[in-house]
């Protein structure tokens, strides 16, 4: 979406990286140990700024501490940027800094891009804090866009004019899909978190013992003790390698549990798989509830005939024109074309 803004005629885009908006947990130590350096955005039209912040925002004086100790440089840069002329403010993750920008920077228009049920990721005081920030942001901006129909329904309790703008994907420079005969993996691309249905994935692996089940992405929950030997872990990999991994998938998995967190999700991996002609096996959750075989999706649950599903996937042929049409429809050039906001 950021590149879509740059391509739409804006002379510059200032991207403020999200900072911690909840209290720290012990599992964060593992994230810090495994953290890899991120390459700065290569588009010279896009400026990246990573603000310093203490992980205390949910506390009564947390925002004040960050205002006093950490945010002077980012506030100054935001003021300079907004003073340059026609300015649109976009809010991804609700935060105290986002609210400060909405209230203090001159701008022509503003929008909230609600990608997830943010409070569902948090617990306790952090959850209450995020609920409040989300409501405040949605009431303050001029437009609210939600990445799934369920999110739009939920947010309409606060903003009746919230609309659904489904996720997009940068499809312009994707390679051509591979031929099915060269694909050998049941694959998953993405984070392995509390929403990941481990029992289902293990059942699939045991039913297809000669087929490698390849998992690509960071892990934030423990692995089961009795993992089948054909499950492979590749860990977190750079974004520019994702297409090459997906091209090796005979099937793309989206094995999510159905709960409060996933009920409003439109998974990016659906677009990644489909843009490269990969058949999708998905549980019935969130926006995936509205997709079926016409969308290249096979709904899965425990107890299915996995051998029959695998054999069916191996003979599935996705026509090149169907892939091209899908890629065009979900590109950010189409998805991000929101009148009055994206045009520079």
Residue ranges of predicted features:
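A short, active-site helix/loop in glycosyltransferases that binds the activated sugar's phosphate group
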Residues: 121, 140-161, 289-291
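Carbohydrate-associated surface elements
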Residues: 150, 165-171, 177-182
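Nucleotide-activated donor-binding/catalytic signature segment of Leloir-type glycosyltransferases, i.e.
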Residues: 221-248
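N-terminal subdomain of nucleotide-sugar transferases
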Residues: 1-34, 206-208
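Membrane-proximal helix-turn-helix segments that form the acceptor-binding/catalytic region
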Residues: 73-86, 112, 122, 126-144
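Conserved donor-binding/catalytic core segment of Leloir-type glycosyltransferases
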Residues: 179-196, 201-205, 214-216
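Nucleotide-sugar-dependent
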Residues: 196, 240, 244-245, 254-275, ...
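A charged, aromatic-enriched C-terminal amphipathic alpha-helix characteristic of glycosyltransferases
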Residues: 300-344
